[in-house]
């Protein structure tokens, strides 16, 4: 099923800028910050890329998508349901515990947490990377040029605000499928 998904994405004109095999070992143990997230199409493109660069890639998706027949398919594809409304749901702790087991694990998260414009990104992706001691790897969705690629790893410094500003500043409004839904950081 994954190969079919990747093939369909390529047929839609997407170019995957893939690192040379084995050249980026950090891609097997990291948190991907995938942005700009302004469309449901981000999921199709992002997962097709993740499956090509990770040995064990997981994608966090809001639980509402798991209702009905799509649920088993999403679980089979390595997706994890997120209950964003439940404060008792410790997804950061669960993700950190998974990393602590060792071995390949990469988690893709859209830090905006919504396809709507947001001024403040969610902090969970930073917390997971910081607590697990793994890098954050920016993953760029460029709808204008139909390209997706990853940037250099960013290790958390302990200064969440500075790290978030650094990461957010990498993503540009013109890359988004719906630029009006992405709030770019002004330098």
What feature does the model see in each segment?
Residues 14-173, 187:
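Soluble catalytic domains of membrane acyltransferases
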Residues 176-187:
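Charged, glycine-interspersed solvent-exposed loop segments at helix/strand-loop junctions
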């Amino acid at each position: 099923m994954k190969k079919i998904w990747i093939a369909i994405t390529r047929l839609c004109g997407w170019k995957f800028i893939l690192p040379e095999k084995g050249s980026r070992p950090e891609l097997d143990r990291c948190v991907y910050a995938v942005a700009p997230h302004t469309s449901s199409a981000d999921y199709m493109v992002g997962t097709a890329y993740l499956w090509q660069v990770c040995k064990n890639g997981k994608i966090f998706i809001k639980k509402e998508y798991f209702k009905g027949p799509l649920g088993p398919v999403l679980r089979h594809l390595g997706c994890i349901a997120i209950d964003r409304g439940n404060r008792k749901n410790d997804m950061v702790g669960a993700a950190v515990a998974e990393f602590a087991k060792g071995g390949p694990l990469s988690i893709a998260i859209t830090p905006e947490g919504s396809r709507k414009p947001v001024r403040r990104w969610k902090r969970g992706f930073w917390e997971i990377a910081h607590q697990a001691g793994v890098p954050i790897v920016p993953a760029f969705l460029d709808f204008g040029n139909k390209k997706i690629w990853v940037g250099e790893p960013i290790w958390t410094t302990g200064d969440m605000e500075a790290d978030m500003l650094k990461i957010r500043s990498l993503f540009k409004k013109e890359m988004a499928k719906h630029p009006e839904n992405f709030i770019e950081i002004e330098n």
